[in-house]
Amino acid sequence: PTVTTQPDGTVEISVTSQTAGVSAVTATINSSTQSQNVTFIADVRTAKIADLVVIKDGSEADGATANTLRARVTDAFGNTLAGQTVSVMAGNGATVAPTVITEPDGTAEISVTSQTAGVSAVTASINNSSQSRDVTFIADVRTAKIADLVVTRDNSVADGAMANTLRVRVTDAFGNTLAGQTVSVLADNGATVAPTVITGQDGTVEISVTSQTAGISTVTATINNSSLSRNVTFVADVRTAQIADLVVIKDGAVADGAMANTLRVEVTDAFGNALAGQTVSVTADNSATVTPTVTTQPDGTVEISVTSQTAGISAVTASINSSSQSRNVTFVADVRTAQIADLVVTQDDSVADGAMANTLRVRVTDAFGNVLAGQTVSVLAGNGATTAPTVTTQPDGTVEISVTSQTAGISAVTATINNSTASQNVMFIA
């Protein structure tokens, strides 16, 4: 507060301060006063980061929109320091200028950009002093796109309940996951899917697809103008295998044990999807022969061949699980092997008056004994007897032969068809 002058009338005044700036120093004696200003400057030797404040946060991780912070540099006593070079670093892939220079007020703004969503730690340093603050970058919903669509479950049963599943992942243009995004979903080939799904915190969401139609269904996920498609496969339900159809495709085969009538059986599940590789049990009645089991082809059908040595109708039955269908096929006698199976005298000992007739019944069959209708049988009679030269068999394969004579005695009657012949004697009496 006081100083004392030296012999020469002067004295030195020393002034110190911890506050940078102008200090007015006033010397007073009696009523005489004078003042002079002195300046104290901040101490760059003790420059430190006094403060680091986030002033803008939550910017998009688009590499262009910035989060900002303000760093303040002072000396050890809090005096602001202009023109100081502050080193800056940012973590998590963020981009920042490596140094900034403080303004006259000792502050400098730091701009940070990133293409990576999440938290980035920004550190400002000078001398041995540093401070860090976290800023957050968010994924850019404006550039939302389908980054991936993966089938996670395939080959489910086409029963309208069992689902194939896919996982869709939504990111922004730089691959940052986006939660809460609405994805549109479509599925073709009759498959059913929720029309929209919403992504979870990890940017993914599961898509469930069901169908009653076996085969490939293309599932498409779309957001904005971005879409991806994947195929899933539904398989027919063997648990509900049934005989969907049994159709005669060839009928009227010859009953020779070799020529076959054929049918086509179709096996599907409860929703009409063709089932390959299914074992169908087959039976045929009326002595027809059939393979006891057949196996369906990729289209769910298989041909059934039926042979018989017995002319007539045979009911063919195809069965799987508790499902069965039957169809009739017809085998016809083989005219190529027509033969005289029997020649029997039905009336004998008629009067030889040229009017009263002896009669015989001829029966024509094929090689397996099936009666043949409509067959022409040649007839001859000996000892002057008279008979029609040909007769035609009835539906039961027989026909009556009438023989008259004016000559008493034995007449040999011969019936012939193809290379088959039979003879019987009849007696005419005077």
Describe the predicted segments one by one.
Residues 1-430:
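The feature marks long extracellular or luminal low-complexity segments
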